[in-house]
């Protein structure tokens, strides 16, 4: 959530910055609501002062023995109290309307983010590795998996439906090896604390990280199978779309001491997404699934450290690709392609031979104080009493399924076997080829 001061005192400037990312702020509605709020705030304060003043007069009248005057003043106070209650209710309604609009407003792009309308205008800043050329017909990961009976889409459809997968044997082991390798790298070399977190979260958590209220249709929500008959209230939960949600919410409603920052946390979880807006896209294979695993990286920093932390966190995700010897490119997202809560985002895109293109495998973002304001996640500087908002960052380190796609296709052999990258072999009991 943006600082409310920006929507009160810098409304036109804020609207202009939001327009750079394709968001039209309803300036006139906000301006009207703010004028009404200020007017009603003055009325509320005046009524409060009148009631307090008249209340004191009751005692004075009684002290003089003028009970008739005291009764008249008490009636006035009751009327003022009723008017004050109405004014407070109106003020609360106006504030709720303003907050409702504020919750739908995305983050402001950083000055270093290039202007653009969509993904076609993202800017490549680095390319690492050279895609291999093959002297045989390249198979995609689906064909490779089915040839080795390691990827079973038919059983997944029978069990759950489309966009799910059953992995078997060495393919399941490779999937597990990837997540173990990523966690070991991030905890042992990059300084992250491994976390095990819930896969079901409450709606407060989803509001905190920005999935709600705007993106509820992208989530899977729990609901009762039948009408509730118990007197116990039903608690609505949602499956996590990313470990960013539970991990970042660790600091919700907390004040962290300056000496304890930065916090660096990582978690391997399944992620669940409805892919509501993806009909017809990537219907074949593991690229776009309802359920997929991901190793997430989260950092909580002081404001002045967050941009350097974004470079560091992105570098940690890049290191995974480099050690796996997977060609990739790094792009900075333009204003029109940024995520809702992001101030600045780098995408890492891995080379997929069968598609002859780079596909996103990691998105690393500095959320600035956008999530922290929603979560009231703060820190206290040494020697200071008043806490400040932290900055939050997150990134994939990496998406396990898409990394597996890249390995299957980039390391395929003419006979359909897959060479295992050297850094993974210790997690595969020394196996050098599968398939």
Curated annotation (Swiss-Prot):
Keywords: Aminoacyl-tRNA synthetase, ATP-binding, Cytoplasm, Ligase, Nucleotide-binding, Protein biosynthesis
Residues involved in ATP binding: 273-275, 360-363
Domain of life: Bacteria
Coiled coil location: none
Pathway note: Aminoacyl-tRNA biosynthesis; selenocysteinyl-tRNA(Sec) biosynthesis; L-seryl-tRNA(Sec) from L-serine and tRNA(Sec): step 1/1
Residues reported in the UniProt entry to bind L-serine: 242-244, 296, 396
Pfam families with a match to the protein in the record: Seryl_tRNA_N, tRNA-synt_2b
EC number, as in UniProt: 6.1.1.11
Gene3D superfamilies, sorted: Bira Bifunctional Protein, Domain 2, Serine-tRNA synthetase, tRNA binding domain
GO molecular function: ATP binding; serine-tRNA ligase activity
Subcellular localization, as worded in the UniProt entry: Cytoplasm
PROSITE patterns the UniProt entry points to: AA_TRNA_LIGASE_II
One Gene Ontology cellular component: cytoplasm
Principal cellular location given in the protein's record: cytoplasm
Top-level EC class: ligase
One GO BP: seryl-tRNA aminoacylation
Catalytic activity as recorded in UniProt: tRNA(Ser) + L-serine + ATP = L-seryl-tRNA(Ser) + AMP + diphosphate + H(+); tRNA(Sec) + L-serine + ATP = L-seryl-tRNA(Sec) + AMP + diphosphate + H(+)
Family according to the record: Belongs to the class-II aminoacyl-tRNA synthetase family. Type-1 seryl-tRNA synthetase subfamily.
NCBIfam families, A to Z: serS
Role description: Catalyzes the attachment of serine to tRNA(Ser). Is also able to aminoacylate tRNA(Sec) with serine, to form the misacylated tRNA L-seryl-tRNA(Sec), which will be further converted into selenocysteinyl-tRNA(Sec).
Domain-related comment: Consists of two distinct domains, a catalytic core and a N-terminal extension that is involved in tRNA binding.
Subunit structure: Homodimer. The tRNA molecule binds across the dimer.
Protein name: Serine--tRNA ligase
Originating species: Aliivibrio salmonicida (strain LFI1238)
Name of the encoding gene: serS
